[in-house]
């Protein structure tokens, strides 16, 4: 398993990080399993595990962040 850090997600809260909508989207669309959420002031990070190579996930990181932002806007 590879650990992936999805960083700098504005507006992310622990409630959104734990939401079934976000969990389902990341697991079904990107094969990412959320392992945790880290918030230190301005930094918001989702920690995920995956069997997919990190270099491949990084190619889709912009799309992943856009999808997460769409969920944040939908929840708030």
Describe the predicted segments one by one.
Residues 2, 35-37, 67:
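Polar/charged side chains located within well-ordered beta-strands of beta-rich proteins
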Residues 19, 53-76:
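Ampiphathic alpha-helical segments that act as solvent-exposed interaction surfaces
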Residues 22, 26-60:
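Acidic, low-complexity, intrinsically disordered interaction modules
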Residues 2-30:
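N-terminal acidic leader/helix
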Residues 1-4, 74-76:
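Short, Lys/Arg-enriched, disordered terminal segments
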Residues 4-7, 12, 39, 51, ...:
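Exposed, low-complexity/repetitive linear segments and helix-based recognition motifs
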Residues 9, 35-37, 75:
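Generic beta-strand hydrophobic packing signal
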